[in-house]
């Protein structure tokens, strides 16, 4: 079954323009435009609204999008199952992932996974928004994804790791090495606040501690916070996972009462995932268990 038109349509929606979609698909721009026009003619509706700024879905496009995604997902499953029957381990797994996992886990997970399954390919979809990752899994944009649990989305999830929140201070700070770290210090010293992604997680920790920090800087990346703290510009709090293999000269301190976020991996329906996705999810679970069990 030739689903090229559907695949071109989905990639165009993802990229927001014919030009960007053509580059990713190794098509000409006119080829992408022709494929979309042919699909619209075949279906008898206008799927995309064209403008100089790019393309957006029409109301009809929004209505048909889930069905087109499901058709392409089913086609991938058929192709992968056929290859399984031939004794081949191939496929593409699209993984939605947030920063700390993509930096600290994914390179090592992918390396060990591909030693077993060298012909399975990956597409990593970065986002630091739990709701966006959950939506990608639900609508088929991603085959699986890492989420902070619990999630309100109706997904099948497996808990991987409890990630503890820590305070970080410059190496020469008066509170460096102070255990437990006093929460009131967050109000007494300049605080660097991460505003990347779902910053409600940080706010929940601060609310539980009962403090309103002395926010002097608002930044978008964890690595920037580490660099600023190491230079003595302030203090902050950060997930322990992001501090793994940290090379900045900062001191990590624990609160008297530990605070955690739960990291999990999720799929839309564990009974309907592709063989490649199943193998990857199982590999991730084993890898995390082995890493933190000893």
Predicted regions: what they are:
Residues 154-159, 163-164, 224-270:
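Beta-alpha-beta core module
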Residues 90-153, 219:
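Central regulatory/effector-binding core of bacterial HTH transcription factors
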Residues 87, 155-191:
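Flexible hinge/capping segments at coil-to-helix
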Residues 189-210, 273-281, 291-292:
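Secondary-structure junction motif
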Residues 42-43, 64-86, 284:
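Alpha-helical linker/hinge and terminal dimerization helices associated
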Residues 40-59:
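A short LG(V/I)-centered, amphipathic sequence patch enriched
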Residues 130-133, 138-141, 148, 197-251:
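Hydrophobic hinge/microswitch elements
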Residues 11-28:
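Short helix-boundary/capping micro-motifs
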């Amino acid at each position: 079954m030739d689903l090229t038109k559907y695949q071109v349509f989905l990639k165009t929606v993802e990229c927001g323009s014919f030009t960007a979609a053509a580059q990713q698909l190794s098509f000409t721009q006119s080829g992408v435009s022709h494929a979309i026009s042919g699909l619209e003619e075949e279906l008898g509706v206008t799927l995309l609204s064209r403008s100089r700024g790019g393309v957006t879905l029409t109301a009809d496009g929004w209505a048909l999008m889930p069905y087109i995604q499901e058709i392409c997902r089913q086609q991938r499953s058929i192709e992968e199952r056929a290859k399984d029957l031939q004794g081949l381990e191939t496929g593409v797994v699209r993984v939605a992932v947030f920063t700390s996992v993509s930096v600290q886990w994914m390179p090592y997970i992918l390396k060990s996974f591909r030693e077993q399954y060298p012909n399975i390919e990956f597409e990593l979809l970065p986002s630091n928004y739990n709701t966006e990752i959950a939506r990608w899994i639900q609508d088929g944009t991603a085959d699986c994804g890492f989420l902070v649990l619990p999630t309100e989305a109706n997904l099948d999830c497996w808990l991987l790791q409890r990630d503890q929140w820590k305070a970080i201070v410059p190496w020469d700070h008066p509170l460096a090495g102070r255990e437990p770290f006093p929460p009131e210090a967050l109000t007494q010293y300049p605080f660097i606040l991460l505003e990347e992604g779902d910053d409600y997680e940080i706010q929940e920790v601060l609310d539980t501690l009962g403090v309103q920090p002395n926010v002097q800087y608002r930044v978008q990346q964890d690595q920037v916070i580490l660099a600023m703290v190491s230079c003595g510009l302030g203090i902050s709090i950060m997930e322990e996972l992001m501090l793994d293999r940290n090379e900045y000269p900062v001191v990590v301190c624990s609160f008297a009462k530990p605070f955690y976020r739960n990291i999990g991996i999720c799929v839309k329906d564990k009974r309907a995932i592709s063989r490649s996705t199943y193998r990857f999810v199982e590999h991730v679970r084993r890898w995390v268990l082995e890493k933190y069990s000893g």
